[in-house]
């Protein structure tokens, strides 16, 4: 199927993950656009996972900061590669961003499910993000597909400027998986 992933499965299974620090460090050796975990776990590297070309593609989240209107302004300008997240029914309550241009292929062994503890305020906000993402899952699918195609196949300058080298990272993910299998 040419679709980025199965729509109904996404709506039912969309959830948060993080990625092992070792794997992120490995990918960053080859691609500087790969986001990374902040030192001392100041902020957890969180995202959602979609399937593409038999890979788990991790799409990282970036948080919205009320005191940083410049970041939101920049994200609005990058609407071709970023999905802005809001509370359902309240576009005046921005919750963060999905960074499609920074998505990375990740082996199953390097994905860590991130359960939500609704006693934590941050996790309550993340639940709102998840609810919103499920409501726009088709938009997420389409944007992920377009970003991948424009960067990996069409070599569109705008997408190449901001996006990870998906084909390179797929090759490195495959090598990493094989390396892990033989250890």
Curated annotation (Swiss-Prot):
Impact reported for residue 66 to A: Wild-type; retains resistance to phage P0008, still has RNase activity
Gene Ontology BP term (one): defense response to virus
Result for mutant: residue 63 to A: Loss of resistance of phage P0008, slightly decreased RNase activity
Keywords assigned: Antiviral defense, Cytoplasm, Endonuclease, Hydrolase, Nuclease, Plasmid, Toxin-antitoxin system
Stimuli inducing this protein: Constitutively expressed in the presence or absence of phage P0008 (in L.lactis subsp. lactis strain IL1403) (at protein level); in the presence of phage the abiQ transcript level decreases while the antiQ transcript does not. Part of the antiQ-abiQ operon.
GO MF: RNA binding; RNA endonuclease activity
Entry annotated with the keyword rRNA-binding: no
GO cellular component: cytoplasm
Compartment(s) of residence: Cytoplasm
Reported impact of residue 78 to E: Loss of resistance of phage P0008, decreased RNase activity
Leading EC class: hydrolase
Phenotype upon gene inactivation: Loss of resistance to bacteriophage.
EC number: 3.1.-.-
Main location: cytoplasm
InterPro entries, A to Z: ToxN/AbiQ_toxin, Type_III_TA_endoRNase
Subunit note: Forms a triangular heterohexamer with a single 35-nt-long repeat of RNA antitoxin AntiQ.
Family as reported in the entry's similarity comment: Belongs to the ToxN/AbiQ toxin family.
Function summary: Toxic component of a type III toxin-antitoxin (TA) system. An endoribonuclease that is probably sequence-specific. It is neutralized by its cognate antitoxin RNA AntiQ, which has 2.8 35 nucleotide-long repeats. Cannot be cloned in L.lactis subsp. cremoris strain NZ9000 in the absence of the antitoxin gene; expression in strain NZ9000 even in the presence of antiQ inhibits growth in a bacteriostatic fashion. Confers resistance to 936 and c2 phages but not P335 phages in L.lactis, causes an abortive infection (Abi phenotype).
Protein name: Endoribonuclease AbiQ
């Amino acid at each position: 199927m040419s679709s980025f992933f199965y729509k109904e499965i996404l709506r039912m299974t969309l959830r948060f993950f993080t990625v092992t620090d070792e794997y992120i460090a490995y990918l960053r050796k080859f691609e500087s656009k790969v986001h990374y975990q902040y030192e001392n776990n100041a902020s957890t590297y969180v995202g959602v996972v979609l399937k593409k070309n038999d890979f788990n593609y991790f799409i990282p989240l970036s948080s919205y900061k009320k005191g940083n209107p410049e970041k939101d302004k920049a994200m609005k300008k990058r609407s071709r590669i970023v999905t802005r997240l809001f509370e359902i029914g309240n576009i005046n309550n921005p919750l963060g961003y999905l960074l499609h241009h920074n998505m990375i292929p990740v082996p199953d062994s390097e994905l860590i499910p991130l359960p939500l503890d609704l006693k934590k305020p941050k996790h309550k906000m993340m639940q709102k993000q998840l609810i919103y993402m499920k409501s726009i899952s088709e938009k997420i699918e389409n944007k992920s597909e377009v970003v991948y195609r424009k960067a990996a196949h069409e070599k569109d300058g705008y997408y190449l400027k901001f996006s990870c080298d998906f084909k390179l990272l797929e090759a490195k993910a495959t090598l990493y998986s094989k390396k892990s299998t033989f250890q």
